[in-house]
Amino acid sequence: MQIYLFNTLTQNKELFEPEDQTNVKMYVCGPTVYDNPHIGNSRSVVVYDLLYRILVDIFEAKSVKYVRNITDVDDKIIERAANLGISINELTDKVTKEFHTNMKYLFCLPPTIEPKATQHIDVMIEIIEKLIKSGHAYIADDHVYFDVLLAPNYTELSNRKLEDMFESVRVENSKTKKHPQDFVLWKPAKPDEDVHMNFKSPWGLGRPGWHIECSAMSYKYLGKNFDIHGGGADLIFPHHTNEIAQSKCAFSNSTYAKYWVHNGFLTVNGEKMSKSLGNFITVRDLMDKQIKGEIVRLFLLTAHYRRPLDYNDKAIEDAKKTLDYWYRAIQNINIQKIDTLPSDFMQSLFDDMNSPLAIKIINDYAKAIFTATNEEEKQFNASNLIACANFIGLMNETPHEWFNKDVDENYINNLINERLEAKKQKNWGLADQIRNKLLNEKIILEDKPNGTTIWRKE
């Protein structure tokens, strides 16, 4: 099978043809580690985790290099550390650890390489020096700026007019810039800043601009040309636009990334997520609410990755009900490992990662189990269900673990025995009272014809 991806650069869905099938290269913008990741950040990670799984299936793990960076030098980091009264290293270490915990919770595979910006300052300086030498960058008032007007096809990714692009974002104006749109490659240290956030350079003590960081790390591990660059749609301009400009100007014959993939925005109850609106939801918030990671992952895959996605309680509850349905479908069935995943399921994912269609196909297997007339039919559908769900990072537990985790089985069994004894004594009121008590605790009882009682979580 062949995979098709929507390329933001060409505005077309294209057949993915890597430069080298034995060395498929993908770079994805990772987190800026100044605060705990929110649910919107997580959508991006889950989307490119799915793409990574697809690429590995086609080209094998040894042939796919997935680079996702950690931005650990940034103005937001300096401000946040100062507000908390802790060192920058303490903050970035803490938030990076939290990010990794969150991604494990969401069943995301680790990237092949996860470089930190602070460990690649030398590469950034090397690229900036190239840009100065070629005339694409200039020094002004201890800053180094990139001259946007000298970049060929600067607007090719956003497909917008230059003046319109800069109306949509805040441009830091400066009398030292040649043009208001020029962006910073290197900025000087401020007297009161943490020394750990500044580095020696030919232009004095300072730190890199945001955009040069990704250009440097992608070049270090993937070279001047690579296959896929991913990130959120909010990064198209200015971040990805500026990456392309500086990288193509720094390296002759560089096309930078061939395929640009961008995921859509995530809202909360129909509104943009922001701390001022009080609807800022971190992954840690969901973990603290005891919402299982699989539920959140399924929710994040329910909409096509390029479409907007709205977070709300009903959407999370619907994802939980879907997983409950799938786990209930495979209960007490002997699952067989299958060598080849169903072609319609794989085709849905190979068609620009159509995860909603893939989820529908999994759901159809669950329905088929409940309507099956023999064990062989049940086993066939259950084996396909679990294989497909596993492929997209779901159903990582047994049905027993899913329904009974964090449940006191002894407590429930004791109440069931009390109820059975009450029924023997014809104390129907007590029997109903026990059933209702467990029902209020989301435990459903089912009386069997042989006189026994089984239970499950709602």
Curated annotation (Swiss-Prot):
One of its GO terms (molecular function) is cysteine-tRNA ligase activity. GO terms for biological process: cysteinyl-tRNA aminoacylation. One of its GO terms (cellular component) is cytosol. ATP binds at K275. It is found in: Cytoplasm. A motif ('KMSKS' region) lies at residues 272-276. Its main location: cytoplasm. Its EC number is 6.1.1.16. The keyword Transmembrane helix does not apply. It catalyses: tRNA(Cys) + L-cysteine + ATP = L-cysteinyl-tRNA(Cys) + AMP + diphosphate. Gene3D superfamilies: Cysteine-tRNA ligase, C-terminal anti-codon recognition domain, HUPs. Pfam families: tRNA-synt_1e. A motif ('HIGH' region) lies at residues 31-41. SMART domains: DALR_2. It comes from the Bacteria. Zn(2+) binds at C29, C214, H239, E243. Monomer. This is Cysteine--tRNA ligase. It comes from Rickettsia bellii (strain OSU 85-389).
